[in-house]
Amino acid sequence: ERDTGHTGNFFNILWSLPGVAQSGPNATGAWMQEFGAWYFDLARRWDGSFPHQGPPEVDGDSYEGWDCTGGYLLAYAMPLKKIYLTGKHPGVAPQLAVAAAQALILDGRGWSNKDRNIAYDKLSEDQLFERLGSWSPVVRERAAMALARRKEVPIPPLLKMLESAALDSRYGACQALIALRGRGAPAIETLRKSLAERDLWLRIKAAEALASIGIPAMQTVPELLTLLAQVDKENDPRGMQQRYLCFALFDSGGEHGVGMLNRSLDGVNRELLDQAVRAGLKNQDGRARGAIGSVYWNLSAEDLKPLLPDIYQAIVEPAPSGEMFADSIRVEGLRLLAKLRIEEGIGACVKYTRDQNPWDSQERTPELMKILLSYGAHAKSVIPELTKIADYFEKEEKNFPKELMIMKAKCVRETIRAIEASTESPELIRLK
């Protein structure tokens, strides 16, 4: 597991021992005995240097050919404690005893990127239920997934775990019900009670479980909308409950599954929905805001009117975190404003085109230009700004591939010509 990673294994290896060492020498020793010692030995070349190992399939490895000797020497320098990265200043993490360190190693076994299931599938039902009560969310999730792969899973033990005094067991029961999806329907009322618990993570996991159960749990939607709209700056300053409820209710799929209200808002209390949407559009996470976008296409133009100022605000004021995914709600908002012929969408679209996250902007820019072009001749007023943006894309944008810069500039200039030739002047509506 250490030898893989979303961006390759370079960072996983670089920060492995400096991270493990925060928990003391017993943790370091256990990790080296399990993995580090043999891995480091095999990684060293005949001349003493350490090249980047790379993934098993090296196609497209952007770190190929790197000399990683310094990263490995950083690990070997841990006992010297000469710099802060190697322990010059004592850390604040609890120092693990030998037994605790070994227990952590055991928790990590039974999984590899090439074979994620076989070890857990060999465990008995009792062993899997025991692992649902683990301190580790990773172990709990793997046990839950293994249970869900079985044809018959008893629900009463999960109901009992949901009422346990041990929070980890309650988390694990929720995780199992998430994996079981509709088969977890008998737990709806117990999960519903968990929505009122004081523990933040328990409320979140209970909400995720209800969303995963799906249609049988639709009766809980009013409570979930109410929870989403709640703001608790003291106990939840980053709005994590709100974040996960955005996914549970509105997400279009992916790791969080399809939200309960993603496809239809029929029968949903409009007052509760509007409150939840307004709150979600202010969440600090761009990905959570993005989930709200499904609402835009499930409401009529008339029903959307009270929400338009909030939708506009979510376009012009980006989320402070989750930047990689923050474009979704902004582009969807611009698309909606154009569909409804909202005048403010013109300026907002141009400003976002210039200020957008460069990541994947070569794909996003044509979308934005298509949105702008739908305003027809009304967009002629922003041609001077578009001209500057095209020049910026072609000549000034930093740290972006030249061929993609030219591609974006060409797209903007083609849009300028199309706007200049446009004779369409749809009637526009002002927000204010």
Which residues are covered by each model-predicted region?
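Polyanion-binding and phosphate-handling cores
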Residues: 5-8, 38-42, 57-62, 67, ...
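Structural detector for internal amphipathic alpha-helices that build alpha-solenoid repeat scaffolds
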Residues: 18, 22, 108-120, 138-152, ...
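Ordered, small/hydrophobic-rich secondary-structure cores
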Residues: 2-38, 135, 154-155, 161-168, ...
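Solvent-exposed loop and edge beta-strand segments that line ligand/cofactor-binding
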Residues: 1-13, 23-26, 51-67, 196, ...
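Terminal, non-catalytic domain-edge segments
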Residues: 11-14, 18-128, 410-432
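Sec-exported extracytoplasmic/periplasmic mature domains
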Residues: 21-25, 41, 45, 77, ...
